Amino acid sequence: MEVILLEKVANLGNLGDKVNIKGGYARNFLLPQGKATVATAENVAAFEARRAELEKAAAEKKAAAEARAAQLSELVVTLGAHAGDEGKLFGSIGTRDIAEAVSAAGYPLEKAEVRLPNGALRNTGEFDVAVHLHTDVETTLKLIIVAE
C-alpha cells in the first residue's frame, strides 16, 4: 500500500515522502494516528496544498521539544525508595515512576517519553535516564535514587 507521510516517522521517512508499506501497518497504525494518508491522486493534490502548513507545524513541534530538552537536561530528580543494606531496592523504579517524579518537579513528562533500555532500575545511586521527546530530539536527565 502506498501512503504519503504527514509527519516524520522513525525508520520509515520524512514529511511528504511517498512510501510503500504493508497494508496492516497503514490501516492499524499510520492512518488512525493521522501520520499518513493513502496516496491517491486527490490526496496527493490536497497534501501539496497543505504542505507548508504541515512543515510549519512540524517545525513548531520540534522547537517545543528542543526547549523541553534544554530544561530537562539540567534537571536532577531525586527519588526515595525502600532498599536493603547493600543498596538493592525492594521493587524497582520504572518509566512511570520517573515520569511522575519529573512531572511533580514541574516539568510535564509522559511515561512513553522515558527510555530505560536495560529495564527498570533496581539499585540506589545516580543514573542518566534517556528521554525521547521527538523523533529528532533526545536528551538525558540525572536521576538519583536514595534509600528511605
Swiss-Prot record:
Q: Which Pfam families match?
A: Ribosomal_L9_C, Ribosomal_L9_N
Its cellular-component GO annotations read: ribonucleoprotein complex; ribosome
**Which UniProt keywords are listed?**
Ribonucleoprotein, Ribosomal protein, RNA-binding, rRNA-binding
Is this entry keyworded Ribonucleoprotein? yes
Question: What name goes with this protein?
Answer: Large ribosomal subunit protein bL9
Q: What does it do?
A: Binds to the 23S rRNA.
Key word Ribosomal protein present in the record? Answer: yes
Task: Give any single GO term for biological process.
Answer: translation
What's one GO MF term for it?
structural constituent of ribosome
- Indicate the family of this protein: Belongs to the bacterial ribosomal protein bL9 family.
Gene3D superfamilies attached to this UniProt entry: Ribosomal protein L9, C-terminal domain, Ribosomal protein L9, N-terminal domain
InterPro entries, alphabetically? Ribosomal_bL9 (IPR000244), Ribosomal_bL9/RNase_H1_N (IPR009027), Ribosomal_bL9_bac/chp (IPR020594), Ribosomal_bL9_C (IPR020069), Ribosomal_bL9_C_sf (IPR036791), Ribosomal_bL9_N (IPR020070), Ribosomal_bL9_N_sf (IPR036935)
